[in-house]
Amino acid sequence: MCVVLIMSACCLAAFAAKAENDSSLQNDNTAKILVCANKGDWQNAPENSVKAIKKCKCDYVSVDVKVTADGIPVLMEDETVDRTCVDENGNAVKGKVSELTYEEIKEFYLRNRNGGLHNEKTKEKVPSLAKVLNETFGQTLILDFALSDLDAVYNIIDTAGAYPQIIFRIDGKVKDVKAALSAKEIVPSFILKYDGNIIFSVNSTINAANSSGLSMVQLGTKNQYGVIFYKNVENKMQSSMIKGVFSMTDGWNAKRDDNYIGWDDVISHGYSIIETNYPAQLNEYISQTEEARTALAELVAKCAEYDSKDYPQNIYESFKTAYNNALSLSGGNASKAQLTQAYTKLRGLCNELDVAQGTSISEAALKITPGRVIAAVLCLAAVVAAQVFFIKRKEK
């Protein structure tokens, strides 16, 4: 297990108080699910390229940063260029990023998608971090890099004035990262990340984020039924107004598939920022989820007119439970499946109430009373008398 710090950097004026440091997206405590595209839209462009970032229509894009031999931060996931790069003739190239100069590495072309021999050369070249910041202005980027590269990365951000655009995700011990950042003129706020399956550590991470006035916490586990999915963990994040971040793209994804089934499951456990390899599909899922939320909210509004005195108690109690659940889900964090199921349940109970009300009226109309018995007897006697009269008249 490991603990990582995600550092969120914002503009100078905001650094006076930690609680005010987070970007507007991070501070958005509405029910909206946010999307983070891992390495950009690498399904349709080279990973960690300017093109891949620009193609993304989502809330965040996470990219990997390495530093060249001459101290220039560039976008690259691996320690080497072997998997993702070729020369101008399409020939394979090799070497560690840390042993190549920027002049050398900037001439390399990127293979399409996630690289490898099966992917062809593209026109995209390895971009520097400075180039990425300049050409993708307006897109919030999560930068994954080593603590040892902090100075090089930080200087680029500082020079570009790109603090509102950037979130740092730094591997390292909490005390080491905090010490390194405390030496900076601008000290960004931080969001704790915990990967593991110890409930005490999960709760401690959330408590630490909450006490620091932070708005996001990232949790991961390799256990399919891990403690990060416990209801009390979800409740703790919600009561602290902290958004849960979950990555579907690494080994700490609790064995969830990066598809609508996995997203639905993770979101149903309270996580509202999802890192994915399929941002377009996740955006579509979220659109469908919001449609389900709107439909449920409209049904909840209509159901507010039902009054307990008008209906059988047993059915109304079931209705009220379903109504309260639907009310909570329509205004809070919920998956598409949760919203759809809540709608179906509430709609069904509304129908039961309507039928029960109709049945009640029919039973009242048919209720046996002394007066109705006398009336029925008199009617029957009248019918019999009429029949006798007509029979005798016919005989004459």
Predicted regions span which residues?
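Phosphate-group recognition and catalysis centered on beta-loop-alpha active-site segments
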Residues: S8-E291
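Hydrophobic alpha-helical membrane-insertion segments, chiefly the h-region
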Residues: M7-F15, A381-V388
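Beta-rich interaction/scaffold domains
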Residues: T289-C379, V383-E395
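Generic detector of short, well-ordered, non-transmembrane alpha-helical segments enriched
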Residues: M1, L12-F15, A322
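Generic secretory/membrane-interface signal
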Residues: C2, C58, G138, C379-A381
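Sec-dependent N-terminal signal peptides
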Residues: M1-M7, A376
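Short beta-strand element of the conserved SAM-dependent methyltransferase core
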Residues: L5, L75, A365-L366
